[in-house]
Curated annotation (Swiss-Prot):
Disrupted-gene phenotype: Mutants are more sensitive to nalidixic acid, mitomycin C and other stresses such as hydrogen peroxide or UV irradiation.
Organism (species): Escherichia coli (strain K12)
Function: Part of the tripartite efflux system EmrYK-TolC, which confers resistance to various drugs.
Periplasmic topological domain residue ranges: 30, 75-84, 127-141, 194-204, 256-273, 329-338, 386-486
Induction: Growth phase-dependent transcription is induced by tetracycline. Expression may be controlled by both RpoS and the Mar system.
UniProt subcellular location: Cell inner membrane
Protein name: Probable multidrug resistance protein EmrY
Amino acid sequence: MAITKSTPAPLTGGTLWCVTIALSLATFMQMLDSTISNVAIPTISGFLGASTDEGTWVITSFGVANAIAIPVTGRLAQRIGELRLFLLSVTFFSLSSLMCSLSTNLDVLIFFRVVQGLMAGPLIPLSQSLLLRNYPPEKRTFALALWSMTVIIAPICGPILGGYICDNFSWGWIFLINVPMGIIVLTLCLTLLKGRETETSPVKMNLPGLTLLVLGVGGLQIMLDKGRDLDWFNSSTIIILTVVSVISLISLVIWESTSENPILDLSLFKSRNFTIGIVSITCAYLFYSGAIVLMPQLLQETMGYNAIWAGLAYAPIGIMPLLISPLIGRYGNKIDMRLLVTFSFLMYAVCYYWRSVTFMPTIDFTGIILPQFFQGFAVACFFLPLTTISFSGLPDNKFANASSMSNFFRTLSGSVGTSLTMTLWGRRESLHHSQLTATIDQFNPVFNSSSQIMDKYYGSLSGVLNEINNEITQQSLSISANEIFRMAAIAFILLTVLVWFAKPPFTAKGVG
């Protein structure tokens, strides 16, 4: 039996502002944590005695756990209440952050990152929902604008703050800073939102669907993360993980298609616009997320950047979204959304290609940040137009499920994109390293003349060869990264074709 409650009156004055700060801070905390570790991977890996490839599990484990938690958030909120679930999520997110900061080996850190990701899943949708519920109807657009600013600002602050912490303090502080923020959120919400819980009802949890989702997505992510270390399909472990993942995902599709209470509402894919929007978001975010993890590591490994400078090199991508996003939100409905998305994808393609032909170990800081700055135009015209296209033609009662599906695929593609990018980068680096090394022999006149000059500085042939090997490694890493950037550019050009199959009008009452 559902527990019904009268709807409390909207908040006003200082109380409303304090609640806005608390809910926005929760969103900021979650978004910050999704990017703050990007520049810290070399530092964390070195401290815990792991390779850089293994260190990326710190990112992907959080992402895949976050993705799994998103589809079940709605049902949990119906069952125990939005406010109660939000407070529990903030509490355990803060506690898991504390445990991450105290981890002494990679396995423990990854375990608590998984817990942290599971607790992070409900934070964004619930903070948004609670904000709208407690604002007067005429001010809800303003509330969403304030809330959205945290979504934009946090990913900019993450790499810079993470770099500063790693260079000046212990890496554990990149997780520990969540604790005081969590305490502030809990204190304000417990005090100001008391008695404002949402209605609850004893909805059934789709345990078979959830189990298949965990096995399918979890198995896929572990397979991608461990594949390189275990030599891919020459390993029985990788084969087993692949079989389990494929069978689970196929079974999940069959189960969810026939279930009366699905975790993933696959019926949404009957809408042409939803399908095109989700495919576009998933593919675009796969390449985008891979690149934003690759860049800081590339700068640190090939150019000797410290963590904070790697973060500063990434930051310009957030300048234009900060300035343009409010304008797109206000005037975007006057423009064909396909034009905005096309502009976004073409800007992505131009910037990735620009980076692929200019990046080398000798590039200066200006050469690095210029493509990042202009890519900000692409980011600003990406999420809102594609979300609008995805939701067009859907009835109002499908919006919650559509939002859940969109966030699920976006978050999952981010983790998969990171794993695929780092795997491809490593494999191509090995190939180019061997190809470049093969040109180094006594019959190469360039090598002979260079080695004679270098011998004066290093005093021995072994010193010369060691320096040459370091140079080959730097060049191999750069060449491999540039290949990935070119691949991303091609993918975004192809996506510009896909988006034009979407059918206007792009409103809730349109026909999808």
